[in-house]
Amino acid sequence: MSPKTETKASVGFKAGVKDYRLTYYTPEYQTKDTDILAAFRVTPQPGVPPEEAGAAVAAESSTGTWTTVWTDGLTSLDRYKGRCYDIEPVPGEETQFIAYVAYPLDLFEEGSVTNLFTSIVGNVFGFKALRALRLEDLRIPPSYSKTFQGPPHGIQVERDKLNKYGRPLLGCTIKPKLGLSAKNYGRAVYECLRGGLDFTKDDENVNSQPFMRWRDRFVFCAEALNKAQAETGEIKGHYLNATAGTCEEMMKRAIFARELGVPIVMHDYLTGGFTANTSLAHYCRDNGLLLHIHRAMHAVIDRQRNHGMHFRVLAKALRMSGGDHIHAGTVVGKLEGERDVTLGFVDLLRDDFIEKDRSRGIYFTQDWVSMPGVLPVASGGIHVWHMPALTEIFGDDSVLQFGGGTLGHPWGNAPGAVANRVALEACVQARNEGRDLAREGNEVIREACKWSPELAAACEIWKEIKFEFDVIDRL
């Protein structure tokens, strides 16, 4: 290159490495109604100031890189950069703090959770200057949430489709989760639905394995629910898992489910991916299918307190991507879930407007501007003795799902379903009469046992079953 045309480092911009905080830490910034706001729990490496660590998060999740580049001069960084606008300590943690970051809306593609997460929870989580990083919450402005379809139908439309009101819905995951033939699987579905459940469910890892191919399962399950509907006079459903190795195969399964006339399909939204999930949600709305969502893999992402992403963020992402149900823990069962934290993200799933409430882990006020709500599903290690607590904790707009708590009944699947239905209706009646389920719940169940031998047998077999471990994710 001739000396006349050689680009000098001193011409046009000043090369080198600058502290992130000089550009991306802006405590004077006033957030806009259109900004996407994030609350990160940051654990910097020793010697890294909080302001520099917070600014690094803002930079690396938006426009920044490790050095100054000449193409910075071709755009407006002030318009597009993320900004760390506040830092606060974490009580009881000397090495951690909460960094609040504001992102301008133009950084993100409309209607794409995939693009949103690629920026905000992308490479920045491997940044060497940070020992750990956790995304605690996101504020999604109406100007962005309105670019999403959201749930295919929502809570009220689902109740209208099922013609079921005034109580939680009852479900059951078919067990053993793997190994049954399609015909035996369909038989278990029929027995549970005939006994009084509203739904049965494929487990998350039931896809199309050698022992039971998906098409055979779909056909036998459709036959089972049609037979149960005819006998009970109630609308029934089975969550047919459409999750597959490719989006094309997933859609093929959803289309076949619709052709069978079933009311609901299922997807593993984290292992399947947000792009696939959003596509399936759009298909379900267009074709009248409800969509049940399983959160398999969530604990890999959300269980550790100092690194990853809290489930409340995954819950918001699912509401935008689309789903009518999602598993949300139980508080009282075998899976992780502290009560206040769980109820915080349950409200974020169901309600239209949720106020900031740090006592429940909600860092920002969230306005969903009439986006349909999602039914939380309580599932995992629950049985009839848990029914009063579940009814009191989750209320009517929920699905209470008993797998082993139905199929483990000593008299069989149908009596197990009867026991759960009787226990639920007893709890709902007691609550409606003004009784305190938190205090009188066990007595309500014992009274119901007097006129339901199925419930009495269930109470006897599970009277000693408890899962008493401290939760990891506390506020």
UniProtKB/Swiss-Prot annotation:
GO terms, biological process: photorespiration; reductive pentose-phosphate cycle
Top EC class, one word: lyase
Active site: 175, 294
InterPro entries (UniProt xref): RuBisCO, RuBisCo_large_chain_AS, RuBisCO_lsu_C, RuBisCO_lsu_C_sf, RuBisCO_lsu_fd_N, RuBisCO_lsu_N_sf, RuBisCO_lsuI
Annotated compartments: Plastid, Chloroplast
GO molecular function: magnesium ion binding; monooxygenase activity; ribulose-bisphosphate carboxylase activity
Residues involved in Mg(2+) binding: 201, 203-204
Required cofactor names: Mg(2+)
PTM sites of type N6-carboxylysine: 201
Keyword field contains Ligase: no
The record's free-text note on cofactor binding: Binds 1 Mg(2+) ion per subunit.
Protein function: RuBisCO catalyzes two reactions: the carboxylation of D-ribulose 1,5-bisphosphate, the primary event in carbon dioxide fixation, as well as the oxidative fragmentation of the pentose substrate in the photorespiration process. Both reactions occur simultaneously and in competition at the same active site.
Name the UniProt record assigns to this protein: Ribulose bisphosphate carboxylase large chain
Organism: Pinus thunbergii (Japanese black pine)
